[in-house]
Amino acid sequence: MKSQKLPRCLAAAALLSLTTAIASAQAQTWPAKAVRIVVGFSAGGPTDVVARAFAEHAARALGQPVIVDNKPGANTILAAEAVASAPADGYTLLLAATNHTMIPALYSARVKFDAVRSFAPVCTLAVSPTVLVTGPAMPAKTLGAFMQQVRETPGQRSYGTPGTGSSGHFASEQFLRMTGLSMNHIPYKGAAQVVTDVIGGQLDSSFATLGSVLPQIQAGKLTALAVASSRRSTLLPQVPTFAEAGVKGYSADAWYGLLVPAGTPAPVLQALEKVAVQFTEQAGTVARLQGMGMEAQHTCGQAFGRDMDRDTRAYIKLAGELQLKAE
């Protein structure tokens, strides 16, 4: 019996060695064909725009076509599943956004992948700071005045979001828990009407991504009280961070970044990271993203992975406290 097992073990070891050698050789020659970037949103949105801008740069840098594949549906779960189950060879990428780390908090029973461990993080490409904006219904011009008015009228002031469980909802509730304030949540089906109603006075405030409200701020229709970043936005240098305004430790940037299937060879990850960093440092990229209220910014590899893991845990905890369920 032992004599039969030994050849089998040797054969298995030889097969594993051969498979590893083939994978290594393929990684060294990557890319030898077109690369696909899967996006969980329809064409035209911020995630899609970042993906297409990166695809143009990557195609030039890699010498191969880089194709954007829009796969909207199920709050980006369909796109994430497609990439998580794809071969870990560097030819299928996911352009993910902040909501990717919210999936476990809202859909853990429905998904077939782990939002963190089923993927290898490459780099973030851009961030869009979250900004607290108010309209005519809320005359406060500073974060301190806003907090004082909310404190004096507990439960009477409102904030709007694109929907229950959205990034705006999580950002708002994190702020309220940190400050001990109470406000009414008014969920909408999309961000556009939220902005319209803050401007019109039907809503007091909203925590919105800067890209979605920058034109209205610049036109004086909305007042920006603070940005939820570690430093001031280059697009709104006159607006303080929450820390500068007295709420330390609060951060709610919306990020856009590249993920690949877990197990992707290190040489491929290194090559992708190099291309991603080059992309964020190009003057053309910086200008293009600024035009959409975004900032080119890269956090790569393990640091990106740690940020994702931290955020995922925080969203799971907050969703439990709020008893949130996916709509």
Predicted regions and their residues:
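Hinge/capping helix and adjacent helix->loop/strand transition within the periplasmic-binding protein
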Residues: 85-91, 106-193, 242, 255-288
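N-terminal secretory signal peptides that target proteins for export/translocation
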Residues: 1-5
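Beta->alpha turn/N-cap motifs
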Residues: 95-100, 171, 191, 208-213, ...
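An extracytoplasmic/periplasmic, membrane-proximal ligand-sensing/linker region
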Residues: 32-34, 177-181, 266-327
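Bacterial N-terminal signal peptides
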Residues: 11-21
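A ligand-binding cleft/hinge motif common to bilobed small-molecule-binding domains
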Residues: 100-108, 176-178, 205-239
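N-terminal (or domain-start) structured segment
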Residues: 26-116, 156, 164, 180-205, ...
